[in-house]
Swiss-Prot record:
NCBIfam families, alphabetized: miaA (TIGR00174)
Stretches of the chain forming a coiled coil according to its record: none
Protein name, entry field: tRNA dimethylallyltransferase
InterPro entries linked to this entry: Dimethylallyltransferase (IPR039657), IPT (IPR018022), P-loop_NTPase (IPR027417)
Catalytic reactions of this protein: adenosine(37) in tRNA + dimethylallyl diphosphate = N(6)-dimethylallyladenosine(37) in tRNA + diphosphate
GO biological process, one term: tRNA modification
Residues bound to substrate: T17, A18, S19, G20, K21, S22
Interaction with substrate tRNA: annotated span: 40-43, 164-168
EC id: 2.5.1.75
Binding site for ATP: G15, P16, T17, A18, S19, G20, K21, S22
Lineage: Bacteria, Pseudomonadati, Pseudomonadota, Alphaproteobacteria, Hyphomicrobiales
SUPFAM superfamilies on file: P-loop containing nucleoside triphosphate hydrolases
Length: 305
């Protein structure tokens, strides 16, 4: 792969949480004169450095890292907002002749990078909040039944238990009078040409991944994750805010309230992380085509990529 930098314009690295993709990203950025750009929707938030496993100074290996920890936890941050920042960064890096190395576990970010993003309309906060409240009170199936009457085409594509997508479809319909499919047909510009990108998905063996997850979550508590959650809770944010949904926040919050012991919080947090990793693995296998190279992290770090 000596001619890699001449053959491609970007490196994309994804994989489940705790898979070792961050270390691989640093290695490849060092080798090809690049920078690392965050592609994880939780690592953008400033308060939760430890709990979201953002790389620290020693792990950055002297490589510049961008789009990490720059969003206040009380601010909503969409895929579109991330894509706009990524586009500006890529344009600058191309002028400077530096390689963008995208690293993260948010599959939608990579899909948007290489396929463009639908130009979705703004939805008033009041509409979104009201529908989310109804979801909690009435359940996803009731709202899916309503969606079937208003937008049968979308209802057929969305599972009756997928509350988040059901609410999204309903809020767009209510705000604009048009089905969400109308907006999904139009796509924004492609930022990264997939045919000129090195694309890697890191997929460790499940026992190895689970062992890493278990060790890492326990270590986080000793490294300051409890203090991070305490600071986050002091902001008194609504539970719907994305930062409040970060894995470990609710378990540590329960521990701080005396509702869980430390051991219970560790087990519950690790269990939620394992479930999340399983969903990520399923998504990567189903959504990433054969042009993505599937490797194990140990193999990746040992090879001359």
């Amino acid at each position: 792969m000596q001619n890699l930098a001449r053959d491609i314009d970007a490196i994309l690295i994804t994989g489940p949480t705790a898979s070792g993709k961050s270390a691989l990203g640093v290695k490849l950025a060092q080798r090809h004169g690049g920078v690392v750009i965050n592609a994880d929707s939780m690592q953008v938030y400033g308060t939760l450095k430890i709990l979201t496993a953002r790389p620290d100074e020693s792990e950055m290996g002297g490589v510049e890292h961008f789009l990490y920890g720059h969003v206040p936890p009380d601010r909503a941050y969409s895929t579109g907002a991330w894509l706009r920042e990524a586009e500006a960064l890529v344009a600058r890096l191309r002028i400077e002749g530096r390689m963008p190395v995208f690293v993260g576990g948010t599959g939608l970010y990579f899909k948007a990078l290489t396929g463009g993003l639908s130009d979705m309309p703004e939805v008033p906060h009041a509409i979104r909040q009201r529908l989310r409240k109804r979801l909690m009170e009435e359940g996803a199936e009731a709202l899916h039944y309503e969606l079937s009457a208003l937008d049968p085409e979308t209802a057929q594509r969305v599972r009756s238990g997928d509350g988040q997508r059901i609410v999204r479809a309903l809020e767009v319909m209510e705000a604009t009078g048009r089905p969400i499919g109308f907006y999904q047909q139009s796509r924004g510009p492609v930022i990264i040409d997939a045919t000129r990108a090195r694309k890697i998905v890191v997929l460790p063996e499940r026992p190895v991944l689970h062992s890493r997850i278990n060790r890492r979550f326990e270590a986080m508590l000793g490294m300051g994750a409890v203090e991070e959650v305490r600071a986050l809770l002091a902001l008194d944010l609504p539970l719907e805010m994305p930062a409040m949904k970060a894995i470990g926040v609710q378990q540590i919050a329960a521990m701080l309230k005396g509702e869980m012991s430390e051991a219970q919080a560790i087990e519950a947090g690790a269990a939620q992380t394992r479930q999340y990793a399983k969903r990520q693995m399923t998504w990567f296998r189903n959504q990433l085509d054969e042009t993505w190279q599937r490797i194990d992290a140990a193999e990746a770090l040992g090879e001359n990529h």
